[in-house]
C-alpha cells in the first residue's frame, strides 16, 4: 500500500531534481523519490556488511603474463561468493570479465579490490546491488 506524504524543497533544488527526472525519464516525482530512497538503503546494506549482490567487471590485457591464472585463482579463493562469470574477447589484446557475486559486502569488496589490483587490469568496476529482501 502506498502512503502519501509531502516535502518542501528549495526552488533551485526542485529545479535540479526535475531535470534529473527528465534525464532519467521517470513518469513522476514519486517514482524518482522511491528510487533515490532505495539506492540509499542499498548503500546502507553495503556499509553494514550485510548480504548483498553485485557485479564486478574487469577489462584486462590478455597478453599480461600470468594474469588470467591470477584472475582465476582469486575467483577460486572466493568461489562461495561467485554466482556466474562471463569472459568476452573484446579484441586481440583486451578481455572483459563479468563476475556476478553475492555474500557479505566486505568479502565482495575484498574480491573486487583484489582483482582490480592485479597488474594488467586496465579498468574495473563494482556495481553494488541489494539482494532485494529489504527493499519491499
UniProtKB/Swiss-Prot annotation:
One of its GO terms (molecular function) is DNA-binding transcription factor activity. Keywords: DNA-binding, Metal-binding, Nickel, Transcription, Transcription regulation. Its cofactor is Ni(2+). SUPFAM superfamilies: ACT-like, Ribbon-helix-helix. InterPro entries: Acetolactate_synth/TF_NikR_C, ACT-like_dom_sf, Arc_rbn_hlx_hlx, CopG, CopG/NikR_regulator, Ni_resp_reg_NikR, Ribbon_hlx_hlx, TF_NikR_Ni-bd_C. Binds 1 nickel ion per subunit. It comes from the Bacteria. It holds the Pfam family NikR_C. Belongs to the transcriptional regulatory CopG/NikR family. This is Putative nickel-responsive regulator. It comes from Desulfotalea psychrophila (strain LSv54 / DSM 12343).
Amino acid at each position: 500500500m502506498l502512503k502519501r506524504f509531502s516535502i518542501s524543497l528549495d526552488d533551485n533544488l526542485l529545479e535540479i531534481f526535475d531535470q534529473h527526472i527528465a534525464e532519467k525519464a521517470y513518469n513522476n516525482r514519486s517514482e524518482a523519490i522511491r528510487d533515490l530512497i532505495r539506492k540509499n538503503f542499498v548503500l546502507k546494506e553495503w556499509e553494514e556488511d550485510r548480504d548483498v549482490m553485485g557485479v564486478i567487471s574487469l577489462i584486462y590485457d590478455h597478453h599480461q603474463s600470468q594474469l588470467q591464472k591470477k584472475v582465476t585463482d582469486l575467483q577460486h579463493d572466493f568461489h562461495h561468493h561467485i554466482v556466474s562469470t562471463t569472459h568476452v574477447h573484446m579484441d586481440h589484446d583486451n578481455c572483459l570479465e563479468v563476475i556476478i557475486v553475492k555474500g557479505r559486502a566486505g568479502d565482495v569488496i575484498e574480491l573486487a579490490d583484489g582483482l582490480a589490483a592485479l597488474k594488467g587490469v586496465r579498468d574495473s568496476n563494482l556495481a553494488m546491488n541489494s539482494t532485494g529482501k529489504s527493499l519491499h
